[in-house]
């Protein structure tokens, strides 16, 4: 009767047991004493069978009522070991659950009604047991231990420590494994939940499957997927879990750790050393500066200035990095002289000799006012370029325009850039973000996104945002910008472009699973193109955040 009508009544006494008991008694009489009801024994057997079928049906209906009442009071403790997590090449396992329908809304509404409070609230003895735990915690510890035991033989055992409301899962009696097709992940996935409800634990489940997929000996090694996890907090449990799964999959040699909080064990990564266009270096650095109000003008100047420095370094055969850029921002004369030497020696070595001779004659009297305090060679170059205005090189011209600024004025307009660069080049972090490729004594690996993707690598990135949010945001966004650049390269040329013919001819389609915990902390201008256009390069983003409002507040829209 309980499931006959549209509106269910599951929060009530299980009256079905009454008719089930009566049916059992009637079946017993018909089977063992048919003469008592004036039945032929043969007919008695048939009547007993009918009563048993009816009684069994009523018992099932009553038991369903009991199950529902127990379900909404006590959420089952569902746990899986790592080996029990199903790994499929078609579907992604999410956990236990059900599709929310109208009946679940009705059931939840019924649970909120005060008339059924006796079925929804814990029993009197349960509440007494919890009170006794608090009261006798120190005086009778054995009693507290007994009452708090999670054994099924404890009738007042506490709820499992899973948090949340048991009503949400309790309104469905028959939960099943919930999966989503892997083909749908290219559209990206957003996981929303408040703090301490299990977002990171869900990330562990999904990352485990991504690491183990195609690692059971049946799949081609080239089908293995890239797994990258950005963790602003630097959760050690997540790091350990990823490493253990990599070992279990036989992929420990493909595992990289980049952790700003533990530079002694961290791999090294140059966030501005790889680029498709040299202008990307300036965008990655200046993108971390504020662009609100009057700061927008300083941000644009910082971009132009860093772009000039990066172009000059590349032309000189140097790899840009944070320390070198910070060095040249504070001493542009050095880079200007180095590039001028390179440029004039290419044009005519005698020109530089002439400039060197003029530099020896420079003094305070013949130095222009805006160049006071500059290196004598800078003054000599200025005089030569003034007299020979037909000589032009875009990089030399950019450096020359920066040098001509009054030094005091120049220091003011780069004032917003220097604090950021100081934070990125202070202490051991500088060794991570500007690796010395010639230091053979440093055995910490150096990685790039191109190398990681080609190796089908696994990367854990801990940004240690609790210690320094600015540095974490700057490094994270630079990594995203580098990844966007790499995605653009893959989209245009494929992953194996530039490799020998036999390798280049192989399929270069690879899935890149990007897991971003505390997504709102990482959200920036660099991340938006990664979401919008990264799917074409195989990037599949799974983002975890507390509320959608956090994302809106972060991007200001």
Task: Place the predicted regions along the sequence by residue.
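Conserved ATP-driven motor cores of ASCE-family P-loop NTPases powering translocation/secretion/packaging/pilus
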Residues: 531-557
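Short acidic-hydrophobic sequence patches enriched in Asp/Glu that either
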Residues: 64, 234, 526, 543, ...
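Short, contiguous acidic/charged loop-to-helix segments that flank catalytic cores in large enzymes
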Residues: 72-76, 466-470, 521-522, 550, ...
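P-loop NTPase motor domains
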Residues: 168-174, 180-539
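Accessory regions of macromolecular translocation/handling assemblies
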Residues: 1-229, 235-253, 271, 276, ...
């Amino acid at each position: 009767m309980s499931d006959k009508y549209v509106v269910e009544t599951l929060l009530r006494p299980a009256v079905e047991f009454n008719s089930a008991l009566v049916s059992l008694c009637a079946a017993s009489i018909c089977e063992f004493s048919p003469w008592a009801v004036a039945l032929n024994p043969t007919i008695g057997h048939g009547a007993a069978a009918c009563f048993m079928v009816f009684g069994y049906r009523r018992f099932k209906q009553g038991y369903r009522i009991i199950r529902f009442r127990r379900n909404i009071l006590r959420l089952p403790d569902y746990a899986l070991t790592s080996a029990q997590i199903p790994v499929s090449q078609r579907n992604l396992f999410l956990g236990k659950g059900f599709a929310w329908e109208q009946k679940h809304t009705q059931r939840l509404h019924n649970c909120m009604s005060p008339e059924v409070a006796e079925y929804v609230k814990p029993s009197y003895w349960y509440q007494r047991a919890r009170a006794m735990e608090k009261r006798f915690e120190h005086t009778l510890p054995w009693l507290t231990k007994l009452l708090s035991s999670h054994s099924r033989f404890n009738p007042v055992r506490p709820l499992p420590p899973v948090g949340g409301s048991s009503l949400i899962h309790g309104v469905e009696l028959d939960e099943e494994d919930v999966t989503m097709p892997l083909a749908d992940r290219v559209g990206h996935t957003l996981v929303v939940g408040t703090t301490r409800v299990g977002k990171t634990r869900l990330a562990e489940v999904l990352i485990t499957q991504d690491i183990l997929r195609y690692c059971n000996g049946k799949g081609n090694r080239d089908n293995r997927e890239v797994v990258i996890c950005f963790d602003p907090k630097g959760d050690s449990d997540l790091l350990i879990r990823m490493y253990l799964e990599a070992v279990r999959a036989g992929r420990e040699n493909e595992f990289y750790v980049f952790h700003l909080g533990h530079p002694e064990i961290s791999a090294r990564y140059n966030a501005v050393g790889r680029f498709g266009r040299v202008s990307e270096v300036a965008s990655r650095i200046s993108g971390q500066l504020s662009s609100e109000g009057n700061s927008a003008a300083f941000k644009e100047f910082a971009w132009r200035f860093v772009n000039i420095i990066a172009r000059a370094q590349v032309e000189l055969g140097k790899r840009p990095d944070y320390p070198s850029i910070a060095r040249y921002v504070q001493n542009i004369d050095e880079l200007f002289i180095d590039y001028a030497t390179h440029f004039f020696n290419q044009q005519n070595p005698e020109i530089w000799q002439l400039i060197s001779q003029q530099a020896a004659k420079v003094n305070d009297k013949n130095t222009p006012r805006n160049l006071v305090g500059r290196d004598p060679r800078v003054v000599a170059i200025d005089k030569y370029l003034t007299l020979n205005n037909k000589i032009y090189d875009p990089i030399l011209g950019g450096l020359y325009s920066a040098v001509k600024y009054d030094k005091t004025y120049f220091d003011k307009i780069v004032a917003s850039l220097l604090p950021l660069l100081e934070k990125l080049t202070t202490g051991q972090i500088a060794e991570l973000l500007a690796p010395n490729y010639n230091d053979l004594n440093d055995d910490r690996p150096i990685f790039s996104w191109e190398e990681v993707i080609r190796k089908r690598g696994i990367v854990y990135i801990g940004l240690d945002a609790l210690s320094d949010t600015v540095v974490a945001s700057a490094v994270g966004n630079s990594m995203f910008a580098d990844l966007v650049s790499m995605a653009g390269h893959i989209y245009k040329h494929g992953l194996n472009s530039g490799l020998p013919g036999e390798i280049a001819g192989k399929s270069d389609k690879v899935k890149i699973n990007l897991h971003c915990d505390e997504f709102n902390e990482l959200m920036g201008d660099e991340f938006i193109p990664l979401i919008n256009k990264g799917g074409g390069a195989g990037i599949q983003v799974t983002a975890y955040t507390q509320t959608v409002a956090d994302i809106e507040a972060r991007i200001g829209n």
